[in-house]
């Protein structure tokens, strides 16, 4: 089933940690493979996902990214697909590689989940059980979008007429009171000239630990 069989949804939520992990906007494709299990479970191709900035960085109400979902696969396919090898995390590499979101696949012998060392691991490279449960417990779906714009720390403020569509606080939302306004908002997003990875994630220049790492030449993407 695709969103063409129902009105396409406009999923909105606040990105509390904008590190380039969820979503992962690198290498020419935007992926949402971790966090936001409700969106990943129910979204269909053709739906639009919009992430707003966090209040802690004074980015609330501003758009960090948007993407149109054009492909949905499961974790195992994501892990094995050569198109997404660069999305596998490489700790110690550039920040784009450190925050790879292609981290889940099943052990062929036991069927148990393997969580690769990543942002969702616990300290000392241990499996982050809480993250594993949240990421895999409700759905195995990975959302993929090639039509997207990611502004990161240069989040974009929408025009005032769309402020009623802004999502604040925790959770996510797709319901709207005005379908015509929703479609106008989507059209506005698609008319913007920016596409793909536009600017670095907000946390890279604001989180103290990442800010220090970002200054190292080897960390640059």
What is the meaning of each model-derived region?
Residues 1-61:
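Short N-terminal edge-element motif at the start of the domain
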Residues 55, 73, 154:
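Short, flexible active-site-adjacent loop segments at beta-strand->alpha-helix junctions, enriched
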Residues 1-6, 36, 76-221:
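Contiguous surface segments at macromolecular interaction interfaces
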Residues 11-13, 52, 65, 78, ...:
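Aromatic side chains
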Residues 48, 61-72:
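Short beta-strand-centered aromatic/proline hotspots
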